[in-house]
Amino acid sequence: MTKKEFIKQYKPFALETERKTGISHLFTLAQAALESGWGERTFGNMLFGIKARPETPADKKQLLRTTEVLNAPNLGYKFPQVLSIYELPNGKYKYEVKDWFRKYETQEECFTDHAQFFFINKRYAKALLVKSDPYKFAEEVAKAGYATAPDYASSLKKIIKMIESYE
């Protein structure tokens, strides 16, 4: 799928999310693009990399490979399966693991759940104050710990800019 095809396919869901919640469709599209590799990794209709919770029913979760960057080498107990751990030059540790992620019946359900995720989790309260500005929202979502990648906000902002150029 090309980037233009990705935008065409998922923009209606992102616009509907923006209409319902006020969260910028540019942010939503950018995060879906980043987390799914522009639609290359959409297992279980999941585009946003939202982790399953312990109480998530078995039919609503899936065990997938992922990368996490953490501060210590002894945090493997946090994951169902650890594949490898490498120390990075900055003193942090890159974990290749399998972890539980949410799974959806439809992609539309995924977009709806993604927006609700920000409203349900109090750590995103500050981000929601700037939800209509995709760049500020990206900064605040990253600060709140959505992902462990150290350059998460800058990656999102580059993709937002790219999507804007296609609109």
Give the location of each predicted region.
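Catalytic cores of secreted/periplasmic lytic hydrolases that degrade extracellular macromolecules
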Residues: 1-167
